[in-house]
UniProtKB/Swiss-Prot annotation:
The keyword Membrane applies. Belongs to the ATPase delta chain family. GO terms for molecular function: proton-transporting ATP synthase activity, rotational mechanism. This is ATP synthase subunit delta. It comes from Pasteurella multocida (strain Pm70).
Length: 177
């Protein structure tokens, strides 16, 4: 687990719990997404490394975000600036999204394939994973031609390696090559 994730998790959990309490999960997701995209900007990264005070940094970020932030979002920005944690906002957004998906009983599943999958193949994988995980799944598909053939399926809890590269690797280990 990265240091940023460790730092981000309590902020994300607090924001998520507050959003649930206020019935404003989508609003908070939008605020965090907008502010995290702003923080990822190269110009903003340089600005954050300047010697400005925390209140000046916070005021600038809040000013740029404008109406995208409500008073609670602004308070979060001020708190993060005071704690010198503004650069953690993208990780907070990711952790927040993870809490949302858990709350909605949605599991994120990464599917890495050697060749592009068609809609039928994606649907079969999604159905099988929904059955196995007992929750809805959100597939994130990507390509890796080094797999030769087949797929690798990853969730937070396990990995299924059905790739030719994985099979060859396991065979080589058994033969001790």
């Amino acid at each position: 687990m990265s240091e940023l994730t460790t730092i981000a998790r309590p902020y994300a959990k607090a924001a998520f719990d507050f959003a649930i309490e206020q019935n404003a999960v989508e609003k908070w997701a939008n605020m965090l997404h907008f502010s995290s995209e702003l923080i990822k900007d190269e110009t903003m990264q340089t600005f954050l490394k300047s010697s400005l005070s925390a209140s000046k940094l916070a005021d600038t970020v809040i000013s740029i975000c404008g109406e995208q932030l409500d008073q609670y979002g602004q308070n979060l920005i001020r708190l993060m600036a005071e704690n010198k944690r503004l650069e953690v906002l993208p990780a907070i957004y990711q952790a927040f999204q993870h809490y949302v998906e858990e709350h909605q009983k949605v599991a994120e599943v990464q599917v890495i394939s050697a060749q592009p999958l068609n809609a039928t193949q994606e649907q079969k994988i999604a159905s099988a994973m929904e059955k196995r995980l007992a929750r809805k799944v959100k597939l994130n598909c990507s390509l890796d031609s080094s797999l030769i053939a087949g797929v690798i399926i990853r969730t937070d809890d396990f990995v299924i390696d059905g790739s030719s590269r994985g099979q060859l690797s396991r065979l080589a280990n058994e033969l001790q090559l």
